From Swiss-Prot:
Binding site for substrate: R94, R104, R132, D217
S-S bridge residues: none
Residue numbers binding NAD(+): 76-87, 275-287
Protein function: Catalyzes the oxidation of 3-carboxy-2-hydroxy-4-methylpentanoate (3-isopropylmalate) to 3-carboxy-4-methyl-2-oxopentanoate. The product decarboxylates to 4-methyl-2 oxopentanoate.
Subcellular location: Cytoplasm
Catalytic activity: (2R,3S)-3-isopropylmalate + NAD(+) = 4-methyl-2-oxopentanoate + CO2 + NADH
Protein species of origin: Listeria innocua serovar 6a (strain ATCC BAA-680 / CLIP 11262)
This protein's encoding gene: leuB
Site positions (Important for catalysis): Y139, K185
Designated name of the protein: 3-isopropylmalate dehydrogenase
Length: 350
């Protein structure tokens, strides 16, 4: 079977880490006899440079026709004053594809627990997932207005928006440790009262999965105090934006973590959580781990290639345990050397 993948390398370190991700895909294809049809297109700043638009029509069409999309990174000071910014392309892509659920796994490999800003005994064995709603809430609510006297933002959520994201969280929890933590502010916000009510309704359809509720301030505190108590966290757009970024620093480096964004139907988008890091671009020092892990997520969640994804995850773990660490992890391994070691581990693994 052939899998169609649209590659959006983007800007800054994006092309370097995308090259790593594609090499990993090629190794998996060779070892397990798969065909990955990879089509590259300009996006973000590269799209502006190539076609005057962060998401040129050809790029959007390729994304819509793909089985999955890989994104490197976008943005940079070069386009700060452009009429359309690179980030506008990502918002447009999310809207065009109907991407409503952002999935961010948080894990701390034993080889880098010493890099976490938290104590080793706190972060050891951390393994949870943040599920963030992407299409509703304060970021998209109307009316929205500001002037010198006052400003208005509107927080709106519909039953459909809430129910589908909470169902997604329960779906993920069913494959993990069967616990969902729903995060809201139901003691203050009307939208959170509806959120909590619907969470209970969804939970009643999944009796084998435990549901707990936390106010967002308590969740933010517990994520630092006892991160190992979480399995799947689900929350609305603004809270998810903040909590997922808070969770990301537990590992000690943004270069470690992947993310996925899913629609109800159609292709999903996989990308590292970090930015384009233009200050280290083209120096062969970027950590490709988050891109490689994004490839693993894609194989697992879009293509159901679980054995192949496990092979990638095991290879990256062995690579780091052997001391191959990039600069952000306190080492001096280059982007290409790290990638080559992972390739070696994939080829030599079971």
């Amino acid at each position: 079977m052939a899998y169609k993948i649209t590659s959006l390398a983007g800007d800054g370190i994006g092309p370097e880490i995308m090259a790593s991700g594609i090499k990993i895909l090629e190794a998996i294809a060779a070892k397990y006899n798969h065909t990955f049809e990879i089509e590259s297109h300009p996006f973000g700043g590269a799209g502006i440079d190539a076609a005057g638009d962060p998401i040129p029509p050809e790029t959007l069409k390729a994304c819509q026709n793909a089985d999955a999309i890989l994104l490197g990174a976008i943005g940079g000071p070069k386009w700060d004053n452009a009429p359309k910014r690179p980030e506008d392309g990502l918002l447009a892509l999310r809207k065009a594809l109907g991407l409503f659920a952002n999935i961010r796994p948080i894990q701390v490999p034993s080889s880098i627990t010493h890099l976490s800003p938290l104590k080793k005994e706190i972060v050891e064995n951390t393994d949870f997932v943040v599920v963030r709603e992407l299409t509703g809430g304060l970021y998209f609510g109307e009316p929205k207005h500001w002037d010198d006297v006052a400003a208005v933002d509107s927080l709106t959520y519909t039953r459909v928006e809430i129910e589908r994201i909470i169902e997604k969280a329960f779906e993920i929890a069913s494959t993990r440790n069967k616990k969902v933590t729903s995060v809201d502010k139901a003691n203050v916000l009307a939208s959170s009262k509806l959120w909590r009510k619907i969470a209970e309704e969804v939970a009643s359809r999944h009796p084998d999965i435990t549901l707990e509720h936390l106010y967002v301030d308590a969740a933010a505190m517990l994520m630092i105090q006892r991160p190992t108590t979480f399995d799947v966290i689900v929350t609305e757009n603004l809270f998810g934006d903040i909590l997922s970024d808070e969770a990301s620093v537990i590992t000690g480096s943004l270069g470690m973590l992947p993310s996925a964004s899913h629609a109800e139907n159609g292709p999903s988008l996989y990308e590292p959580i970090h930015g384009s890091a233009p200050d280290i671009a083209n120096q062969n020092i970027a950590n490709p781990m988050s891109m490689i892990s994004s490839v693993s997520m894609m194989l697992r969640q879009s293509f159901s290639l679980f054995k192949e994804a496990d092979a990638i995850d095991a290879a990256t773990a062995r690579t780091m345990q052997a001391g191959f660490l990039t600069a952000d992890l306190g080492g001096n391994t280059s982007t290409t050397d790290f990638t080559n070691e992972v390739l070696k581990q994939i080829e030599g693994g079971e």
